[in-house]
Swiss-Prot record:
Monomer. This is Ribosomal RNA small subunit methyltransferase C. It holds the Pfam family MTS_N. Belongs to the methyltransferase superfamily. RsmC family. One of its GO terms (molecular function) is 16S rRNA (guanine(1207)-N(2))-methyltransferase activity. The gene is rsmC. Keywords: Cytoplasm, Methyltransferase, rRNA processing, S-adenosyl-L-methionine, Transferase. It catalyses: guanosine(1207) in 16S rRNA + S-adenosyl-L-methionine = N(2)-methylguanosine(1207) in 16S rRNA + S-adenosyl-L-homocysteine + H(+). The keyword Cytoplasm applies. PANTHER family: RIBOSOMAL RNA SMALL SUBUNIT METHYLTRANSFERASE C. The keyword Transferase applies.
Length: 343
């Protein structure tokens, strides 16, 4: 996070307006502008662990990571700068949370790319902080309003639920495949062998559906789940609990917080970070897997068929197999061998 996003570049056109403000930055924080903008004081709240990692190095305790912001997170702020995400329910969760904490009279700025649907901020906040568009550049919109009424916020009302083959999946806004099991995960699940044993790590666990489906027909596996997303971590914990399955779940930027080695690592890795296309997480997953697999252990991932993962798998493990595929997706398998250890 060094170069500024288009949304941040639009904000910088108004940097003089923020010099005397005590600002809370929140939403889809894709760069480190919150740490670099000249203000009277700056705080940041994010639901994304990898964004918090970057910001906390520069902002210390003034950068916070959690599912739900608290009064302490917004203390003494008189301005909110909210970066609109690509997911409207996620924006509603975060904005209703934040506006329920900020005092009436707080200046509200909402910025985002037009393709993300930032225009819908006007309707969403009409009853609380009526917005006007104050700038348009870099295919982004910047909106301004003032908080007139605090909304009521109840995080419990944002939970969703669906069933997959008799399993209960708990979800929250911003979690991948919130409305049902995606095709890629279905393909990966079809390759998992019943009665598997050992330690299994689910990286980028989302709502936890891969892990609970695996554990149902392989009850002796020991599960560890991680994700960069606070909503995903909480959703996975709830999904495990709803199905009576035990497992450790925590926030991690791929392997950043993972300790130890595993017999299998499974993943449906993301290739979008907000509105941006990024292969970094998946490549970090593949290259880092050799440090977290036991000898003979395997990495098994599903990905869009067009993504360039075979070369990275071969560079890291020495070989790979495609064990299932459709027109759109492939399931890759790589085994931890002595050859892989040299990589």
């Amino acid at each position: 996070m060094s170069a500024f996003t288009p949304a941040s570049e639009v904000l910088l056109r108004h940097s003089d307006d923020f010099e005397q403000s005590r600002i809370l930055f929140a939403g889809d924080l894709q760069d480190d502008l919150p740490a670099r903008l000249d203000t009277a004081a700056s705080r940041a709240h994010t639901q994304q662990f990898h964004h918090w990692q970057v910001l906390s190095r520069q902002m210390g305790d003034n950068a916070r990571f959690s599912l739900v912001a608290t009064a302490d997170d917004v203390a003494d702020c008189d301005t909110l700068i909210y970066y609109w995400p690509k997911n409207k329910p996620e924006a509603q969760f975060q904005l209703m949370n934040l506006l329920s904490l900020l005092p009436v009279g707080t200046d509200i700025f909402v910025v985002g790319e037009n393709r993300s649907g930032v225009r819908s901020a006007e309707q969403m906040l009409a009853d609380y902080a009526p917005l006007n568009k104050v700038d348009s550049a870099r295919r982004c919109g910047l909106y301004f309003g003032r908080l007139e009424k605090q909304p009521m916020f109840d995080a419990d009302k944002f939970w969703g639920e669906y069933n997959v083959d008799g399993l209960t999946v708990k979800t929250l806004p911003g979690v991948f495949s919130r409305d049902g099991l995606d095709v890629g995960s279905q393909l990966l699940l079809s390759t998992l062998t019943p009665h598997t044993k050992g330690k299994v790590l689910d990286v980028g666990c989302g709502a936890g559906v891969l892990s609970v489906a695996f554990a149902r027909h392989s009850p002796k596996i020991r599960l560890t789940l991680c994700d960069v997303s606070a909503p995903a971590v909480e959703a996975s914990r709830a999904t495990l609990a709803a199905n009576g399955i035990e497992g450790e779940v925590f926030a991690s930027n791929v392997f950043s917080e993972v300790k130890g080695r595993f017999d299998m690592i499974i993943s449906n890795p993301p290739f979008h970070d907000g509105m941006q296309t990024s292969l970094d997480a998946a490549q970090t997953l593949i290259r880092g897997a050799v440090r977290h697999l036991n000898s003979g252990g395997e990495l098994r991932i599903v990905a869009n068929a067009f993504l360039p993962y075979p070369d990275v798998l071969d560079e890291t493990f020495g070989f790979h197999e495609v064990i299932a595929q459709t027109g759109r997706f492939k399931v890759y398998r790589a085994i931890m061998t002595r050859q892989a250890k040299k990589g």
